[in-house]
């Protein structure tokens, strides 16, 4: 079992009934309102002691589109997102630095998203990293976003919706804890 991605058997559609995937922006990365999330999903997460505060949508079109290798925070940490991915021909790679004592592999710390100027994350140089895991993302999956990772779309359109998981004290939920919370939903 890997420590980067767990596909789930969770039959709750992420969006409200009156919100279509086509209603979401078609920019590469978008911060969207928690109000679009299905109330049944919010209730389910609340029962598990989980709050969400950040909801993002992604739109990757075209053949061989590669996101920049990045972490969803200014520095490496242990942070979990719940993700729903639409599309057939995509994977996510996770990376680790060749030399974890050398932080020169960060090429753009505290980067902002060009579409809205508010994103805070770090981009990495591929030359200094080794792939440690590759996986197709399920519908939904728990993914580790506190280490370098990258979505790759081979063909067609890839859409995804992600939520950062927080506990009741507003701390981000690390992957081992998320795996424990969702253990009865993890697919083999």
Where on the chain are the PLM-derived regions?
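N-terminal auxiliary "cap/dimerization" subdomain that precedes the catalytic jelly-roll/cupin core
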Residues: 1-43, 139, 155-156, 167-188
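Catalytic core of non-heme Fe(II) oxygenases with the double-stranded beta-helix
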Residues: 61-137
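Catalytic core of Fe(II)/2-oxoglutarate
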Residues: 113-188
């Amino acid at each position: 079992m890997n420590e980067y991605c767990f596909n789930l058997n969770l039959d709750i559609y992420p969006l409200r009934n009156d919100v279509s995937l086509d209603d979401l922006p078609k920019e590469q990365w978008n911060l969207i309102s928690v109000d679009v999330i299905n109330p049944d999903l919010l209730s389910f997460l609340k029962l598990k002691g989980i709050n969400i505060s950040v909801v993002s949508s992604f739109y990757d079109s075209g053949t061989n589109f590669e996101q920049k290798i990045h972490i969803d925070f200014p520095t490496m940490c242990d942070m979990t997102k719940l993700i729903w991915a639409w599309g057939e021909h995509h994977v996510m790679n996770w990376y680790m630095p060749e030399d974890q004592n050398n932080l020169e592999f960060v090429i753009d710390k505290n980067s902002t998203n060009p579409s809205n100027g508010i994103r805070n994350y770090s981009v990495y140089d591929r030359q200094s990293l080794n792939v440690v895991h590759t996986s197709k993302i399920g519908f939904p999956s728990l993914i580790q976003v506190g280490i370098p990772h990258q979505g790759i779309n081979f063909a067609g359109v890839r859409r995804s919706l992600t939520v950062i998981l927080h506990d009741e004290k507003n701390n981000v939920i690390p992957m081992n804890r998320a795996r424990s919370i969702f253990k009865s939903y993890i697919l083999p």
